[in-house]
């Protein structure tokens, strides 16, 4: 594996870490309706656990309400039950073929707890990015030791990996600040 491949591989893994952070933060309720928080819910569809997005269309009715419209009328009860039984603490209400999921307002205390969770997620992602940097640097040192790349190449690649790490950390901080702001907005 060359230094360029190591850099490319590390960059891809860092981007995956950022995407993972974004998806995990999307599941954190902020008081504002976001269909993304229902994505991980599975519905019992004729005996098979199926993602909610495959059995119903998700949309926003207003800033605090998500509309869930099952593709089959017979699935309304199952979808409603799956949402109610999820760990999100939501209380869906069925209106014919449409299920309305109101997002309850968050208390100040709950908002503060959620910001702590967000910070923790961000810190975990930063640790993952730093571990990727460490692994890449170790790999580069091995290549230098085995005389596959020169010390200058190693130094250049290490500097570039450090720049990628710094950029990823800045991106993580931006994402965290944005989510905290979203949570704290009443």
UniProtKB/Swiss-Prot annotation:
Keyword Acetylation recorded: no
Function: Responsible for the release of ribosomes from messenger RNA at the termination of protein biosynthesis. May increase the efficiency of translation by recycling ribosomes from one round of translation to another.
Pfam families: RRF
Keywords: Cytoplasm, Protein biosynthesis
Protein's UniProt name: Ribosome-recycling factor
NCBIfam families linked: frr
Keyword flag NADP: no
Swiss-Prot/TrEMBL GO biological process terms: cytoplasmic translational termination
Cellular component, GO annotation: cytosol
Origin superkingdom: Bacteria
A Gene Ontology molecular function term of the record: ribosomal large subunit binding
Location(s) in or outside the cell: Cytoplasm
Protein family (similarity comment): Belongs to the RRF family.
Main location group: cytoplasm
HAMAP family per the UniProt record, alphabetical: RRF (MF_00040)
Source species taxonomy: Bacteria, Pseudomonadati, Pseudomonadota, Betaproteobacteria, Burkholderiales
Source organism of this protein record: Polynucleobacter asymbioticus (strain DSM 18221 / CIP 109841 / QLW-P1DMWA-1)
InterPro entries, alphabetized: Ribosome_recyc_fac, Ribosome_recyc_fac_dom, RRF_sf
UniProt-listed SUPFAM superfamilies: Ribosome recycling factor, RRF
């Amino acid at each position: 594996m060359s230094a360029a491949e190591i850099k490319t591989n590390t960059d891809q893994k860092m981007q995956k870490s950022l995407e993972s952070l974004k998806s995990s933060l999307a599941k954190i309720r902020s008081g504002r309706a976001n269909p993304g928080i229902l994505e991980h819910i599975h519905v019992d569809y004729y005996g098979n656990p199926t993602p909610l997005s495959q059995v119903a269309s998700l949309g926003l009715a207003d800033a605090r309400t998500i509309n869930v419209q099952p593709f089959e009328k017979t699935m309304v009860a199952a979808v409603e039950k799956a949402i109610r039984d999820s760990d999100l603490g939501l209380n869906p209400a069925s209106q014919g073929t449409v299920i309305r999921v109101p997002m309850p307002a968050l208390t100040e205390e709950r908002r503060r707890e959620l910001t702590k969770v967000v910070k923790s997620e961000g810190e975990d992602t930063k640790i993952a990015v730093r571990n990727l940097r460490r692994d890449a640097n170790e790999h580069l040192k091995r290549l230098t030791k085995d005389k596959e790349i020169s010390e200058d190449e190693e130094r250049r690649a290490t500097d570039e990996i450090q720049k990628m790490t710094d950029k990823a950390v800045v991106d993580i901080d931006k994402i965290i600040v944005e989510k905290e702001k979203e949570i704290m907005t009443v």
